[in-house]
């Protein structure tokens, strides 16, 4: 990946709705080589998908929580079962296997505290293998980005 590819990726991260001509102008290429570079980045998997970022407040996701999950045993079957369960939960925006004092960190988005309690009681707490769940709630966000510095 060269500097031009990084510029193209930067432009797409800023606004994926731009057309190839706009991107080409900004990175100093013509349309055809810009298009070909974008296609190559897609084929290599560097560009995974194009998404629309939503304003969580305007769609009613008022509560963001980070749940720290500890499993009682690190057995392959329990890990696989845990992962399968988490993938079915629409409330879970992110799930990371981490090192440290707990095993997994979940980012959860729900409409209100009642929905969060339902999620914990009816879904998360019944997942086999979980020994502890600790939750922290976002009060204010100072930085929330999806862009990587290239």
Stretch-by-stretch model annotation:
Residues 1-150:
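A compositional/biophysical signature of low hydrophobicity enriched in polar/charged and small residues
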């Amino acid at each position: 990946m060269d500097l031009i590819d990084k510029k193209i990726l930067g432009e797409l991260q800023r606004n994926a709705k731009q057309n190839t001509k706009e991107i080409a102008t900004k990175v100093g290429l013509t349309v055809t080589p810009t298009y070909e570079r974008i296609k190559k980045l897609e084929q290599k998997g560097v560009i995974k998908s194009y998404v629309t970022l939503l304003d969580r407040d305007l769609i009613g996701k008022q509560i963001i929580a980070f749940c720290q999950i500890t499993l009682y045993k690190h057995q392959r079957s329990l890990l696989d079962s845990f992962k399968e369960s988490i993938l079915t939960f629409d409330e879970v925006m992110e799930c990371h296997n981490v090192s440290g004092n707990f095993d997994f960190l979940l980012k959860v988005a729900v409409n209100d505290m009642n929905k969060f309690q339902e999620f914990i009681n009816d879904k998360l707490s019944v997942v086999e293998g979980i020994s502890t769940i600790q939750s922290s709630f976002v009060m204010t966000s100072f930085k929330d980005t999806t862009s990587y510095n290239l």
